[in-house]
Amino acid sequence: MKFTEPAVLPPRKTSEKLLMGPGPSNADARVLRAMSEPMLGHLDPDFLEIMNETRELLKYVFQTENELTMAMPGTGSAGMEAAYANTVLPGMKVIVCVHGVFGQRMTDVASRYGAEVVRVESPMGRPIDPEALAKAIKENPDAKIVGIVHAETSTGVLQPMEEIAKLVHDAGMFLLVDCVTSLGGVEVPVDKLAFDMTYSGTQKCLNCPPGLAPLTVSKRMGEWIKNRPTPVKNWYLDLNMIMRYWGEDRFYHHTAPINMTYALNEALRIILEEGIENRWERHWANARRFWAALETMGMKLVVEEKYRLPSLTTYYTPEGVDEAKVRKYLMDKYKIEIGGGLGELKGKIHRVGLMGVNASPAKMTLLTAALCDAFDAQGYKCDAAAALAALSD
């Protein structure tokens, strides 16, 4: 069989855009330069040293001493898959807290590995009520795992974790935590609250291209995985093998994403230079200013202030405004990307990411002015001067 040779392709058409949606976020220029450094072999001593350094930097960002800390190949969804692939046995009872689309996704993933899933639910835009979890634990004392989303990307809810963690550990269960939209933007208290497995993604508050899933595992969780009675059903995400590659053995399991690891290493160096606590405070300070600007514009925010995530803000679009047309206007005129709603909030809200380098006064000013213009184009009038003034208060 003869195949037609493709025509000479034109140059790729890409342009700089301001990514202020739910992710990916813009990467720092230093991170992009790091990706272009010379390729090394995945067992080259120089690359193994970069892996070691990256692990230590991840421990700093996760605020943990867990030795089982690594960057899994794949996006944040691979982190979720790894968490449940390694911990779930067929027929095991797993409690999953669902307060948005990504909690729902947890139930799907756990079910595919044979879990009997018990759902603890709250409405989208609200956190999980510890009393509801306590009830589920009491009714299901044989459950082994509790899974929860720390930062629900579909709603912008930051889940309070102190009571949740205590309930889980008092019951002798393992706690699996999704921190895809919180790591690097808000405190992720892995050791303080004894999270057993915590995973994230590189493309949000870490300001790195998508492709790796930072993951950290407690000692007791690691021992359980090591001694599980049956092999992990997902060969590629089997932590028993991957841990040996990231550990002293340097056991070959897969070819690591070499240049993505360079990028993550550089992104984590930038965080270290700023200081993790300074970074958290910057996200909080800028988010509060942006919330004030939105309220000045007449926007109703989805989440009650005490449960808002600083790295992702959600608001209802005004009556009579087509939210998709607003997003298209921002992209066409300003090259700014923001997100729409998911699930039951589709068509009703916008999701705006203030992540890493994009959590800055200059970028919030540009976005706020552009939003006022986009709303005005649909006949919704807001006081742009007042909104911009609110950013500086």
Predicted regions and their residues:
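A glycine-/small-polar-enriched, mobile loop at the entrance of the PLP active site in fold-type I
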Residues: 16-72, 77
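Active-site C-terminal subdomain of aminotransferase-like
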Residues: 26-27, 203-292, 296
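Conserved beta-loop-alpha segment that forms the PLP phosphate-binding cup at the N-terminus of a helix
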Residues: 55-58, 65-95, 99, 103-108
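Active-site phosphate-binding strand-loop segment of PLP-dependent enzymes
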Residues: 127-184, 197, 205
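Conserved active-site segment immediately N-terminal to the catalytic lysine
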Residues: 191-203
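Conserved PLP-binding catalytic core of the aspartate aminotransferase-like
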Residues: 300-333
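PLP-dependent enzyme catalytic core of the Aspartate aminotransferase-like
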Residues: 344, 348-393
